[in-house]
């Protein structure tokens, strides 16, 4: 009888250990810390949030944020270049642990991924040639507007200006190139991106026409990872308190981040 009780106890302990092991394996934060590497999806076609420098090294606000997260976790950083259309898919298929890619929060995305608190300011607008008149959403009707497929700007433009002729491109470079080449009268992007274009070539005829939204950036996380989300929020709050976020924003966007939503 004692032998049978001992056997049952051993079985129970084994099952508990297996369950505990599986739980740890399913915890993204524990996996990252054990692996000693964090895989972060970042943009390389969306300056100043993410681009490739002359030395072929990724640079930008999002890259600096990814570097800060890795440093605070004490792990090595692995950067994974993504575009607007695939940055959420990389999270869903577990090709990345995080997406730090000027990601806005939408009801559709909240169904499939979770978010940290905001880490960067960002607002979207429609830009066009100076001679084009468009002061509101109605005046965008019939105008050919380039946009990156699956981006926040794509969603906003489709909802706010259904009468616009929207031409979708697979990445930000394609969107900007279409406007510069005259394939579109206007294009939708973030104001920081537009400022970068103007800085590189002041001769470009381009004015802000209509603001689409003022939506900050969040870190995207796989669904059901509360420990990882909590740790990211802790890192971001500390960076806001220390002034690191404001310094990052001044470096890449030309102004402090200011008050960011929780």
Language-model region placement:
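Acidic, polar ligand-binding/catalytic clefts
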Residues: 67, 71, 76-139, 203-205, ...
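Extracytoplasmic small-molecule ligand-binding "clamshell" domains
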Residues: 25-102
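Ligand-binding clefts/hinges and TM-proximal coupling segments of bilobed small-molecule sensing domains
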Residues: 26-27, 152-169, 206-208, 236-262
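Ligand-binding cleft/hinge of the Venus flytrap
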Residues: 51-54, 66-75, 137, 153-169, ...
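Alpha-to-beta junction loops
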Residues: 38-39, 74-76, 93-101, 162, ...
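Periplasmic-binding protein-like
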Residues: 120-128, 195-237, 255-262
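Short helix-initiation/N-cap motifs at beta->coil->alpha
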Residues: 63, 78-89, 152, 167-177, ...
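Extended ligand-binding regions for polar small-molecule ligands
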Residues: 63-72, 134, 138-139, 143-144, ...
């Amino acid at each position: 009888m004692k032998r049978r009780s001992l056997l049952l106890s051993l079985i129970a302990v084994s099952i508990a250990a297996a369950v505990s092991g599986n739980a740890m394996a399913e915890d993204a934060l524990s996996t990252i810390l054990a692996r000693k590497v964090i895989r972060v999806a970042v943009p390389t076609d969306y300056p100043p949030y993410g681009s490739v420098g002359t030395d072929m090294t990724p640079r930008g606000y999002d890259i600096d944020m990814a570097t800060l997260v890795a440093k605070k976790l004490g792990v090595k950083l692995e950067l994974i270049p993504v575009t607007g259309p695939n940055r959420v898919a990389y999270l869903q298929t577990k090709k990345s642990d995080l997406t730090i890619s000027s990601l806005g929060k939408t009801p559709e995305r909240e169904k499939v991924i979770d978010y940290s608190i905001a880490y960067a300011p960002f607002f979207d607008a429609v830009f066009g040639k100076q001679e084009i008149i468009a002061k509101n959403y109605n005046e965008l009707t019939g105008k050919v507007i380039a946009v990156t497929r699956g981006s926040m700007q794509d969603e906003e433009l489709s909802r706010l200006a259904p009468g616009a002729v929207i031409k979708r491109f697979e990445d930000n470079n394609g969107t900007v190139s279409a406007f510069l080449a005259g394939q579109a009268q206007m294009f939708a992007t973030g104001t920081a991106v537009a400022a970068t274009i103007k800085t590189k070539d002041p001769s470009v005829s381009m004015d802000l026409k209509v603001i689409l939204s003022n939506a900050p950036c969040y870190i995207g996380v796989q669904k059901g990872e509360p420990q990882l989300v909590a740790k990211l929020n802790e890192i971001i709050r500390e960076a806001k308190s220390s002034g690191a976020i404001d310094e990052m924003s001044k470096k890449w966007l030309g102004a402090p981040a200011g008050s960011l939503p929780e």
